[in-house]
Amino acid sequence: MEFTVDKYENYSIAKINQEKVDSGVSPELKSEFMNLAQDGVKSLIVDMANVKYVDSSGLSALLVGNRSFSESGVFVLYNVTDHVMKLISISQLDKVMTIVAGQEEAADAVLLAEINKGQGTAE
């Protein structure tokens, strides 16, 4: 699977360079998400621009990513193609995952999550 990660101070950006996220690549994608979380990445932003198709195992991998980062920070998808967004919406995953249009909005979502988590622990 083609997958690149750029690490920044408050988050990392993962780019999936794969047109199909299906049963052939989803186990590796799940593993990548879990490894990043175990390596101390608090929030992960995922660039989905190159992904044209996901099947149920691909959606499952995205859910694993969402779960892996929900405790420490946030999991954000951006640049989601129309077809993939339809599949995410049909499966109602758009109700549990943070999905935004671009990288700037994704970075803002990370900042907002940090502020909200900070308020929860300050009380």
Where are these regions (language model features)?
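STAS-typified acidic loop motif
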Residues: 2-34
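General small-molecule cofactor/ligand-binding pocket signal
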Residues: 4-6, 78, 98-100
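Residues that form or immediately flank small-molecule/cofactor binding pockets and catalytic motifs
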Residues: 10, 82, 104
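Amphipathic alpha-helical interaction surfaces in cytosolic regulatory modules
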Residues: 21-97
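A charged, well-structured terminal subsegment
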Residues: 101-123
